[in-house]
UniProtKB/Swiss-Prot annotation:
GO terms for biological process: nitrogen fixation. Belongs to the NifW family. It comes from Frankia sp. (strain EuIK1). Homotrimer; associates with NifD. This is Nitrogenase-stabilizing/protective protein NifW. Residues 104-126 are annotated as: Disordered. Keywords: Nitrogen fixation. The gene is nifW. InterPro entries: NifW (IPR004893).
Amino acid sequence: MSALTRQLEEFRRCSTAEQYFELLDVDYDPRVVAVNRLHILRYFAEEIAGLHEGADAEVSPEVLLRDYRAALIRAYEAFTTATGLDHRLFKVLKDRAPEPAGFVATTDITVERPATAQSDEKGQDR
């Protein structure tokens, strides 16, 4: 068994965010992970779920680990600039997403006057 195959097996046994960061050699701030652990793991899981779908041939451990590392970096960076509320990855947050406020530009507003009001105004101008 090659070193990469062993590393891939170890990847499959990881159970904490820190284990993934250490195994894939990704630098991280423990404070960011402490606050966003579940969000990072969820984002990471969604990222790797779509990797190599429909690949005709078996993907090598080297390619898998490289792509897993890139996915973990994307997941981590997503939460260094935004919060869990911004991403809303979990159902409880999706369900409580605020409705966007309606916006109507003033150029879209038209005022229509009833016909009687227009004739009254014309009579007043005389």
